[in-house]
């Protein structure tokens, strides 16, 4: 899980981000989490 939150992928370090994501995404695989973070980046880029 944490490999998707490394410094290269998530530029902003938010306290508790990994714990909050773990609580809100039970049963997600690594691929699911990667897709979630990619979609979030795309949406942020559009704004």
Swiss-Prot record:
One of its GO terms (molecular function) is ATP binding. It is an enzyme of class 3 (hydrolase). Its EC number is 3.4.24.-. GO terms for biological process: cell division; proteolysis. Its cofactor is Zn(2+). GO terms for cellular component: chloroplast membrane. Binds 1 zinc ion per subunit. Keywords: ATP-binding, Cell cycle, Cell division, Chloroplast, Hydrolase, Membrane, Metal-binding, Metalloprotease, Nucleotide-binding, Plastid, Protease, Zinc. Pfam families: AAA_lid_3 (PF17862). It is found in: Plastid, Chloroplast membrane. It is a multi-pass membrane protein. It comes from the Eukaryota. Signal peptide: none annotated. In the N-terminal section; belongs to the AAA ATPase family. Seems to act as an ATP-dependent zinc metallopeptidase. This is ATP-dependent zinc metalloprotease FTSH, chloroplastic. The lineage of its organism: Eukaryota, Viridiplantae, Streptophyta, Embryophyta, Tracheophyta.
């Amino acid at each position: 899980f944490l490999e998707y939150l490394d410094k290269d992928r998530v530029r902003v370090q938010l306290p508790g981000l990994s714990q909050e994501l773990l609580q809100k995404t039970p049963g997600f695989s690594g691929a699911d989490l990667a897709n979630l973070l990619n979609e979030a980046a795309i949406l942020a880029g559009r704004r």
